[in-house]
Regions:
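Basic/polar N-terminal segments that are highly enriched at the extreme N-terminus
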Residues: 2, 24-33
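Bacterial N-terminal signal peptides that target proteins for export
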Residues: 2-13
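Bacterial N-terminal signal peptides
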Residues: 13-23
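Sequence/structural signature of beta-propeller modules
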Residues: 29-62
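Extracytoplasmic/lumenal domain signature
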Residues: 35, 56-85, 96-100, 105-136, ...
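Gly/Pro-rich cap/lid or specificity-loop segments adjacent to the active site
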Residues: 92
């Protein structure tokens, strides 16, 4: 279902002209190329900056003029037992198209200018009813296939496979199993998004909400063929736990970093669970790692946040509410900071958002916190990346699960996800001051990261669909 607002039509012709020009330019080249203003991967690249420096159209001064360009909602369920068209994965924007998977198991290519469906493919859904999400959570990456020079969409699907799809029509180039063959597909779930770097693809697997636990792992594939190259297990054979439901980061030297989940049941040993692990990019052998100290552990205190590379550091927030900044070389703690409260039954995924890194500051979304004596259910703050010192902090009425995002115009978008009756929204914030510039009422939960691309803002609401905004 698609809605294009009348107010958008005067602007629409200009956007179509830009995208058409890009398409003609791409056609004249031997291979298409992702533009600097695109958002072609989860957290906008292997370093996970969540920052689009080249996209500058939306600024603090133009935010009041932001209007809805179009709104789209996926196809309803048509099969027995199929979940509805909720959106838990984030949009990927490349080459004039938006790619997104729905909870129904359908994966879509939409026209960036109008929201019209250009192609779709069904890739399955989980039969187990243990989580709200049973279809897509994994966010796609669009990258040039080294074997043919063509843009290709890589995505982890609900059926347990990593897919390579042609960006033109979503036809399949190859697929490779991520789940361990000795386990049924329904025991595993691909929360992780694929990270493409240096001719390889990295993706992790985890359980379906710990029911039951699975043996966590990270797998490396050849980008051109889908052949499995290496597999890192977080716990030894015979143990279950350490699921990787975050997405791997890659630094400028090619080293891979993975944050891991739940401690194995029935043992006091942690192995590589509840840790941030540095891995060899070719063999996935662990080179160094940080494990959350016993004094900071609690029941469900795993890492849901993906690691982010910033300067000489790598860091991620744990569900204990603490962000750990680690020296990349030694994986020792450079600094740590309590960002929000621990996870609870009512708010089970605290501090699961990755921060923004714009080259000078970190912007970290938190959960229940107190600012100047006032209690807030959520927050976002700007930090000095060298020390963790707070530069500004802004309270939000609800908690944050999806990572915040920022463009080169100095605007941050952060959505809230809360089970209370308090309305959720996407908040647009001035990156310089922390002032809330505008509240985009979404009418429901925002689990996915909003993204800035090609002068637009794309917000995916769990039950209300995908909305494109433009000034």
């Amino acid at each position: 279902m698609l809605f294009v607002t009348r107010a958008w039509w005067p602007r629409l012709t200009g956007v179509i002209a830009i995208l058409a020009s890009r398409a003609l330019t791409a056609a004249a080249q031997p291979a298409p190329a992702v533009a600097p203003t695109d958002w072609a991967a989860y957290l906008n690249g292997a370093a996970h900056s969540s920052f689009n420096a080249a996209d500058t159209a939306i600024t603090p001064s133009t935010v009041p003029a932001l209007v809805q360009a179009w709104h789209w909602k996926g196809d309803p369920a048509t099969m027995t037992g199929q979940p509805g068209p909720a959106l838990f994965s984030s949009p990927t924007v490349a080459d004039g198209a938006v790619y997104i998977g729905a909870n129904t198991g359908w994966f879509y290519k939409l026209d960036e200018a109008t929201g019209a469906v250009l192609a779709k493919v069904f890739l399955g859904y989980q039969p187990k009813l243990t989580c709200a999400a049973r279809g897509f959570i994994s966010t796609a990456t669009v990258a040039v296939d080294p074997s043919d020079g063509q843009d290709t969409v890589y995505v982890g699907a609900p059926d347990g496979y990593l897919y390579a799809l042609r960006a033109t029509d979503l036809s399949q180039k190859w697929r490779s199993a991520v789940d361990i063959p000795s386990q049924t597909v329904s025991d595993y779930f691909l929360w992780s998004s694929p990270t493409v770097a240096n001719g390889k693809i990295y993706i992790g697997s985890a359980s379906h909400c710990d029911k039951p636990l699975t043996r966590g792992d990270l797998v490396a594939y050849d980008q051109a063929t889908g052949q499995e190259l290496a597999r890192f297990f977080t716990v030894p054979a015979g143990f279950l736990g350490g699921g990787i439901w975050s997405s791997a980061a890659v630094d400028g030297s090619g080293y891979v970093y993975a944050s891991t989940g739940t401690q194995p049941a029935g043992t006091s040993q942690r192995f590589y669970s509840v840790s941030i692990v540095k891995l060899d990019p070719n063999t996935l052998q662990p080179l160094a790692w940080f494990t959350v100290p016993n004094s900071q552990l609690f029941g469900d205190g795993d890492f849901g946040a993906s690691p982010v590379i910033f300067g000489p550091y790598v860091g991620a927030c744990n569900k204990n509410g603490i962000f750990y900044a680690l020296d990349q070389a030694t994986m020792t703690v450079a600094w740590e900071k309590q960002i929000g409260a621990k996870s609870t039954a009512a708010s089970p995924a605290q501090c699961s958002a990755a921060p923004i890194y714009d080259g000078t500051s970190l912007y970290m979304a938190g959960d229940p916190t107190t600012i100047n004596g006032v209690a807030y259910r959520g927050s976002i703050q700007r930090l000095d990346p060298s020390t963790g010192a707070t530069l500004w902090e802004t309270g939000l009425p609800n908690s944050v699960i999806g990572s915040p995002t920022m463009n080169g115009g100095g605007v941050i978008a952060v959505g809230t996800y809360d089970f209370t009756s308090t309305p959720n929204a996407v908040y647009l914030i001035d990156a310089s001051t922390g002032a809330i510039l505008r509240t985009l009422t979404t009418g429901g939960y925002t689990f996915a990261q909003s993204v800035f691309a090609d002068g637009m803002l794309f917000t995916a609401n769990v039950y209300r669909g995908l909305t494109a905004w433009h000034v």
